[in-house]
């Protein structure tokens, strides 16, 4: 099923079925042998029924192992499984979901996850400013994998960047990068998948909101 998102002056159709964010886990436990590998671009299952993509994984100022995904993928308390290893059980929980900026925070269990900074063809080393026209941006999604395209920029100054990049259901939350710099996430497409523009929230807006709110996600830095 699609989520319908209002993006600026257009109706945007959500590109995924669910969400994934936040898992529980205390202290500095080490991942066990064979723990699911999770990073920006990993597929996740929310509440054992919906699929989305992890934007990034890292630590916040409180030392928690946290990640991001699209806000329409789930609500606080939603359980998260690894798509590649459902047998590993619940690996995290959504702890916060912001429907205005359409992002969510997941707290992962450090004893059940192996966090990495590279999935597929995307490596994330830092978080940066929004993409500007005519930059080329790329994403790594659990459905369509690695695709790239021309960024049009934040056309309506709404903390969302438009890009000509193929995304479909399940890609929601996918990291959008320039090189190894994370600049945004995938949230929606306009009109027709892989033909209409992709629309996604800027990472700068997400980071600013997490820092202002405090708690899980504040002071975030990628693995």
Language-model regions: role of each:
Residues 102-105, 158-166:
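Short, solvent-exposed secondary-structure boundary/capping segments
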Residues 1-31:
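Secretory targeting and sorting signals
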Residues 46-155, 178-179:
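Serine endopeptidase catalytic core focused on the charge-relay Asp
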Residues 31-37:
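Cleaved targeting-peptide boundary
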Residues 70-75, 184-191:
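Short beta->alpha transition motifs characteristic of CBS
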Residues 166-187:
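Catalytic nucleophile loop of clan PA
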Residues 108-121, 190-223:
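C-terminal cap/linker of serine protease catalytic domains
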């Amino acid at each position: 099923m699609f989520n319908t998102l209002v993006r600026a002056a257009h109706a945007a159709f959500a590109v995924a079925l669910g969400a994934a964010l936040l898992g529980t886990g205390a202290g500095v436990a080490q991942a066990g042998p064979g723990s699911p590998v999770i990073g920006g671009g990993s597929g996740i299952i929310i509440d054992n029924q919906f699929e989305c993509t992890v934007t990034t994984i890292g630590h916040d100022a409180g030392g928690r192992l946290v990640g991001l995904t699209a806000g329409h993928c789930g609500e606080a308390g939603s359980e998260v499984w690894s798509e590649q290893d459902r047998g590993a059980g619940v690996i995290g929980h959504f702890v916060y979901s912001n429907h205005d900026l359409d992002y969510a925070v997941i707290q992962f269990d450090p004893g059940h996850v192996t966090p990495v900074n590279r999935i597929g063809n995307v490596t994330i080393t830092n978080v940066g400013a929004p993409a500007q026209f005519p930059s080329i941006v790329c994403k790594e999604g659990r459905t369509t994998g690695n695709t790239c395209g021309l960024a049009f920029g934040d056309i309506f100054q709404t903390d969302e960047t438009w890009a000509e990049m193929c995304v479909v259901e399940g890609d929601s939350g996918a990291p959008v990068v320039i090189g190894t710099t994370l600049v945004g996430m995938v949230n929606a497409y306009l009109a027709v998948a892989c033909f209409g523009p992709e629309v996604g929230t800027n990472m700068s807006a997400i980071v600013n909101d997490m820092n202002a709110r405090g708690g899980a996600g504040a002071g975030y830095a990628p693995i």
